[in-house]
A protein has these predicted regions:
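Acidic, polar ligand-binding/catalytic clefts
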Residues: 1-58, 135
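Short helix-initiation/N-cap motifs at beta->coil->alpha
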Residues: 1-9, 51, 90-101, 105
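A ligand-binding cleft/hinge motif common to bilobed small-molecule-binding domains
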Residues: 6, 22-31, 75-78, 104, ...
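Hydrophobic residues within well-ordered alpha-helices
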Residues: 11-12, 59, 103-104, 143, ...
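Periplasmic-binding protein-like
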Residues: 40-47, 72-76, 119, 123-177, 180-191
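Short loop->beta-strand "edge-of-pocket" segments that line small-molecule binding or catalytic clefts
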Residues: 57-73, 88
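Ligand-binding cleft/hinge of the Venus flytrap
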Residues: 72-93, 122-126
């Protein structure tokens, strides 16, 4: 596990070879050498089960937890154009564990992140959390290598990932984690 805010430095100095963890390709197409996309993911919001927050518009004036340097952080800080209401406070955490602990303890009213990561945690305790039906953003996920490196490996990996999409492997894995296989593999429009 790496410190997510340090990911670019770790990649550029060779400490890590690639970034492969719910990493959005959207808006970063020219910043990295990409393999994929291997799946689609939505940015979603989770709240405590008893919360009065039912929709994105209910986030107005609320405290939001996000992981630092993520798409969710950019959305709530207004760095990416969105129709989100103005929130009271955006709290950025180094890890998803810290972000979800803040929700559990009531330090934030809601948390936002990639559907796969949020589902991983909320599915462990479905009686305590729920995910809003509306999504913040949809994106393609890929494997990022430092720009100008590993072009052959990225091409081979892209082909392998495409084969895994076609033969149903990625869909089966998605279902094991409580995700909609069709949307995860083929996006909102489906196959």
């Amino acid at each position: 596990m790496i410190s997510w805010p340090d990911k670019n430095n770790l990649l550029s100095d060779g400490t890590i070879d690639c970034i492969w963890s719910c990493f959005s390709m959207n808006g970063r197409e020219t910043k990295y050498q990409w393999a994929g996309p291997y799946m689609y993911s939505r940015q979603v919001v989770a709240v405590r089960a008893g919360s009065d927050i039912q929709s994105l518009s209910d986030l107005a004036g609320k405290r939001i937890g996000v992981q630092a340097t993520t798409k969710a952080e950019s959305l709530f800080l207004g760095e990416i154009s969105s129709l989100l209401p103005e929130v009271k406070q955006v709290n950025s955490f180094e890890t998803t564990e810290d972000m979800l602990a803040a929700l559990r303890k009531g330090y934030v009213d809601a948390v936002a992140g990639h559907e796969a990561l949020v589902a991983k945690w909320t599915n462990l305790d479905e009686s305590s959390y729920r995910v809003l039906d509306e999504s913040l953003y949809s994106s393609e996920l890929g494997v990022a290598f430092a720009k100008g490196t590993h072009a052959d490996l990225a091409a081979q990996l892209t082909q392998t990932l495409e084969d895994m999409k076609q033969d149903g492997t990625i869909g089966r894995v998605a279902e094991k984690f409580g995700l909609d296989a069709e949307k995860t593999v083929w996006g909102e429009q489906g196959k």
